[in-house]
Amino acid sequence: MEHRSKMEFFQKLGYSQEDVVRVLGKLGDSALVNDVLQELIQTGSRPRAQEDPASGTGVVLIPRGCCGVQDSAQQGPGTRPRRGWRRSSPLLRPIVIDGSNVAMSHGNKEAFSCRGIRLAVDWFTDRGHTYIKVFVPSWRKEPSRSDTPIREQHVLEELERQAVLVYTPSRKVNGKRVVCYDDRYIVKVAYEKDGIIVSNDNYRDLQNENPEWKWFIEQRLLMFSFVNDRFMPPDDPLGRRGPTLSNFLSKKPRPPEPSWQHCPYGKKCTYGVKCRFYHPERPHHGQLSVADELRAKTRAWLGGGAEEPRTPSARSRPTTARLLPQEPGEHDLPPAPQPAVLAALNRSFARLTFSDTAASGVVSQSRGPDWMPTGVPTSWAPPSLRAGSAATIGLPGMRSLRTPNNPLSPGDLGSPICPQARLSERHRSRDMHSDLPPQRRPLEDPWALLPSSYCYLNHSVWSESAWGEDIFRGPSESAQPVANGGGTRPVHCSFFPPDQDHPVMASGPPLSDMALLTLLQRSQKTGAPLGDP
């Protein structure tokens, strides 16, 4: 850099030509710029703007920190502090300043320093607050005394002319000063304006006086500190977990800015919405936890192309839901039979006769009247099978004759095998289904769920053609199809092996009453129902 260019450069920085020539003569024209600046600083040279602030050519640099304004000692008598560098905003809360507390805090509790009030007012004015009120007792306008020193009292006059300062009333009575309670003015005006109280006083007496004021003072009190001539309110007026100073002074606080620090776990993070770090892979959708994401994916998968589930209780309905929860006991009992089926059963069993001495093998030929009219009775009590035992069996037990798996119809009951033979076959097939649960055993035989007292029917009853209008056939009529191996062979072959089925089919007449009684007694000794599979 040439000598001339260096001279112009340092003169633009504000140094005088004499100082620059002196330093360059000492260090030489080939000296570096940093070395020249260091020498100028060490020799005490300063720019002209700082040496002569009152000159018209100098530029006064005003700091933009919290102080915001030059001290009153550095300002000229006619100069006003620079305010309003931020545009006024109606969203800022009104400010009510406790003038006595602020002035005494700035005077270090020794003097009433009016400069502290000016610094506080200028700080809020620079932030853009338009409503600022300072309350000071009126006796502070009196001349300063040794017991009550007042500094820079002219500041109060300036603030009063600007309609910022308000004097609270006070007077003298019999030579004694009567002062009104200025704190009540401060709290009342701030409460009505929904503003901020600037003071280091807690106003405990006023908190106990009014519960509404208690909450307001706790939430709207702004404390402060003075660092030399710098007014410094805290950045967190209500504590570390409270709002920031900007939100505290605003009517509509802004939400906190999100943290842009990337999560150290990246895509492997399992905190979900609770993670306080930034995830760039989740910019356009809400952050969900892992469990919520799995639930959402499961719902979408079931609702999109899932097949309609089916319930395991209905074999005849393949489209019933399987995965849907079932109510307890919903499929434990079979559905009630239709009224027409009950009426047909009542007509069919109206001619049954029972033996009171069936255990001895003597069968009674007597026949009772039609004691079960059509559609009327729903429960009945059969005769006692043994001495001292009487069982009441209800007709609703017959509902098991019609189930979703085996509906009762005349075609199903029209089997060429007599009921005694079918009962014998059911007893022989008990071992085949003993390992199945009770509710899952096959119900292909409607005689399987009949009470055991049906086994003691008179032999002549089965031979009557009026029984069920040929629905059930007697032993004499069923012997012919059995011997011929008619329509019963497919039924037997489906449940019994051929080596057991052929001898039974070729034995001629069906089982006698004595054989049937022996089978029934054996079933009763084991304790299992006769028709239980």
UniProtKB/Swiss-Prot annotation:
Residues 262-368 are annotated as: Necessary for interaction with ZC3H12A. Keywords: Cytoplasm, Endonuclease, Hydrolase, Magnesium, Metal-binding, Nuclease, Zinc, Zinc-finger. One of its GO terms (cellular component) is cytoplasm. InterPro entries: Rege-1_UBA-like, RNase_Zc3h12_NYN, ZC3H12/N4BP1_RNase_Reg, Znf_CCCH. It is found in: Cytoplasm; Cytoplasm, P-body. A zinc finger (C3H1-type) spans 251-282. It comes from the Eukaryota. May regulate cell growth likely by suppressing RB1 phosphorylation. May function as RNase and regulate the levels of target RNA species (Potential). In association with ZC3H12A enhances the degradation of interleukin IL-6 mRNA level in activated macrophages. Serve as a tumor suppressor in certain leukemia cells. Overexpression inhibits the G1 to S phase progression through suppression of RB1 phosphorylation. Belongs to the ZC3H12 family. This is Probable ribonuclease ZC3H12D. It comes from Mus musculus (Mouse).
